[in-house]
Regions:
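Extracellular/luminal low-complexity Ser/Thr/Pro-rich, glycosylation-prone repeat/linker regions
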Residues: 1-58, 153-188
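Intrinsically disordered, low-complexity Pro/Gly/Ser/Thr-rich segments with frequent PxxP/GP/PP motifs
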Residues: 102-139
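Short edge beta-strand/loop segments characteristic of extracellular beta-sandwich folds
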Residues: 69-73, 133-135
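Short glycine/proline/serine/threonine-rich loop/turn segments at secondary-structure transition edges
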Residues: 138-149
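Asparagine-centered strand-capping/turn motif at beta-strand->loop junctions
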Residues: 71-76, 188
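Structural beta-strand segments of beta-rich domains
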Residues: 64-68
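Short aromatic-acidic-glycine turn motif
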Residues: 29-31, 89-103, 157-158
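Short acidic, flexible loop segments centered on an aromatic residue
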Residues: 77-94
C-alpha cells in the first residue's frame, strides 16, 4: 500500500500498488596471480610482474619437484567456485604436473562434480592459495624452457576467467669432478 500524509500526519491519499519481484544480479570476477597481498592483474599470460613467474632448474640426476605459488582471488560480489585448467608446453611426458592446496602436498579435487579440478567455494573478496607442482623422476630431464598456463574460470559464468603463466628454465648438470692427489705433493 502507498499512503501520502500532510504535515499533521493526516492521510491525504491511500492506494494499493503492484508488487514487483526482481533479482539483483551480482557481478562475478576472478584474478589469478602470485600476490598474497592483493588482486593485481596484468592481463592474460604475459610478462607482467603479476602474470609471469620464472624459476631456474638444474637437473642433477635425482628426482625432484618444483613448485610455483598462486593465489585465486574472488573479485566479484558473490561466493563462487573456480575451475582450474592447465596448458603446458615443452614438458616431457615423463614429468608429472599437479595442482595442490597451499600446503604443497594435498591435491586439489573437483568439489562440484563437473569433472574439473577447482578451488571449492570462495567468498567474495577472499583468496585461495594454490600451488603448481612439476615432478621429475630421476631419469626425466630436458633443456627446454617449459611454460605452464593456468586459468581460473567461474563455474557460474565461464566467460569470467583469468590466466597466469609459470616458466621453468632448465639446464643439465653433466656430472661432477673430484680431483684427488694421492701422494699429497700438490701436483696434479
Amino acid at each position: 500500500d502507498y499512503q501520502q500524509y500532510n504535515a499533521s500526519n493526516t492521510v491525504l491519499k491511500s492506494t494499493t500498488t503492484n508488487t514487483v519481484i526482481f533479482n539483483v544480479q551480482q557481478t562475478l570476477g576472478v584474478v589469478l596471480n602470485y600476490s598474497h597481498a592483493n588482486a593485481n592483474d596484468d592481463g592474460e599470460p604475459n610478462s607482467g610482474a603479476n602474470n609471469l613467474q620464472t624459476q631456474n632448474n638444474t637437473f642433477a640426476g635425482t628426482a625432484k619437484e618444483i613448485q610455483f605459488d598462486h593465489y585465486v582471488w574472488n573479485t566479484g560480489q558473490a561466493t563462487d567456485t573456480y575451475n582450474l585448467s592447465l596448458i603446458k608446453s615443452n614438458v616431457p611426458s615423463c614429468a608429472v604436473v599437479r595442482l595442490y592446496h597451499a600446503d604443497g602436498r594435498t591435491l586439489l579435487t573437483d568439489s562440484n562434480g563437473d569433472g574439473i579440478v577447482d578451488t571449492g567455494g570462495l567468498a567474495a573478496g577472499l583468496s585461495k592459495a594454490i600451488k603448481l607442482g612439476i615432478y621429475f623422476p630421476a631419469n626425466c630431464t630436458s633443456t627446454a624452457s617449459m611454460d605452464f598456463d593456468i586459468t581460473a574460470a567461474s563455474i557460474t559464468d565461464t566467460a569470467v576467467r583469468n590466466s597466469t603463466r609459470d616458466r621453468l628454465i632448465n639446464t643439465l648438470n653433466i656430472g661432477d669432478s673430484d680431483l684427488y692427489n694421492s701422494n699429497n705433493s700438490g701436483l696434479g
